[in-house]
Amino acid sequence: MLNTLLLIGGLALILAGANGLTDGSAAVAKRFRISDLVIGLTIVAFGTSAPELVISVLSALNGSAEMAIGNVVGSNIFNALMIIGCTALVLPIKVGEGTMSKEIPLVILSSLVLFVCAKDMMLDREAVYVISRSDGFVLLAFFLIFMRYTFAIARNGADEAGEEQKIKEMPVWKSVLYIAGGLAGLIFGGQLFVDGASGLARSWGVSESVIGLTLVAGGTSLPELATSVTAALKKNPGIAIGNVIGSNLFNIFFVLGCSATVSPLPMGNINNLDLSVLIASSLLLWLVGWFFRKRTITRLEGALMVGCYVVYTAYLIAQQ
């Protein structure tokens, strides 16, 4: 019971902290006349991935490497299969040609890069599979390249978009209070969440990798799921694609990059199956959008994606 309360309370603090940090930082940036484009691509993007970042970094520091990796791998699988699948069940998703030819292949590439980093035992000179500090720097280098690419395409399309970030205006003292409170919520909530998840793993007799791949991953992805389904209910399901692409790239390149830089991450029970499902889920997202019904992910395909996630999760639990 205590572990469940720690998990729920920690997640609530993390989400509240992420919102506070994002709102406060964006208000300060706006006061210093930083453009909405830069705010959206940096502060807001960081805020949406802050739960995964905090949990993975704290897990790495606490010696729970499997939970750190499982959180990222599981979140990305959840995003690609459950979020896109549930959104398509509400309303079919039309995918732009640029997204199909450029952005989704980047997600596939990120999954392949992670696979190579996880399996380069000889290069790391380790006796076990590990995402080393050097791998972390490689992932962060890819993140910088991705951000440079994102800024370039955003500037090119800025005039066409015409939509600004909705940023709360507030006094400087209030912004600082939001930032400080947000950071405190993220750190304290993250520690509670990691402690609760580790405790549940021990009490249930399951590995931390399974907890990370399922419970932790699903919990940290709930904001993206809620945002995407709400957008579909408002007849704008395409937002889900942007959410998933941005989140998945951020998770692998930045979250895992930072976590591995803080402390090398042995793969442990995160095996070839989990990494293969990660790659397959990215490929499936590309295939259903590219080859069927003129770049539209239909309700039937959405049901297929949700079904794939349910089968994968059931397999993980059955193996314990």
Locations of the language-model features?
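Hydrophobic alpha-helical segments, chiefly the membrane-spanning helices
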Residues: 1-320
